Swiss-Prot record:
The PWWP domain harbors the heparin-binding sites and is responsible for DNA-binding, while the C-terminal region is essentially unstructured. The N-terminal region does not contain a typical signal sequence but is required for secretion. It also determines exosomal location. One of its GO terms (cellular component) is cytoplasm. This is Hepatoma-derived growth factor. The lineage of its organism: Eukaryota, Metazoa, Chordata, Craniata, Vertebrata. GO terms for molecular function: DNA-binding transcription repressor activity, RNA polymerase II-specific; growth factor activity; heparin binding; nucleotide binding; RNA polymerase II cis-regulatory region sequence-specific DNA binding; transcription corepressor activity; transcription corepressor binding; tubulin binding. Residues 116-128, 135-173, 181-197, 223-237 have a biased composition (Basic and acidic residues). The modification N6-acetyllysine is found at residue 44.
Amino acid sequence: MSRSNRQKEYKCGDLVFAKMKGYPHWPARIDEMPEAAVKSTANKYQVFFFGTHETAFLGPKDLFPYEESKEKFGKPNKRKGFSEGLWEIENNPTVKASGYQSSQKKSCAEEPEVEPEAHEGDGDKKGNAEGSSDEEGKLVIDEPAKEKNEKGMLKRRAGDMLEDSPKRPKESGDHEEEEKEIAALEGERPLPVEMEKNSTPSEPDSGQGPPPEEEEGEEEAAKEEAEAQGVRDHESL
């Protein structure tokens, strides 16, 4: 009876073999439960399983002292994590893996809930730091890109200026040629008028004077009229 009473009295840190349905007797450690869990899990202990780093609430009937049951339940087993659990309970009984953080909320530590929050805060800080470093990296990457783009734009502008500069003399030369052609056309336009002026005396209908044959006929007619007038004057006498 005294032994059975002892089995029911476990304290935080005791090493045991814990039996769960569907699993062999597993190397485990008793963890102290918080006050909130004591009422809901009366007469039960929070157990941390070595190897798997999982936790469960078990009664005294499913717990067996490790040292007394080591020969009986400590035989090798093919279940995943069992061999690791046997090694941890012997060599590192106070192990606290990453998966054990959830059980730390119900462990012997008086500030279990603060630690995960601190870790989360650290994670956020790390995330922010990483984010800021990423942003800085982006800024650093963007600055050379901007410089390259600006240099590329300057090169393009310089190329455009070089391409435009030979075009401008061509355009000015084209304007000069066009002006010469216009001047030549303007110089050629008065020529037909001058030709017309020069050609008018040669035309028979210009009115400058009759041809020589007509002049001779007129002189003969004038002589005949003068002779006829003389005859008339003579007859009148």
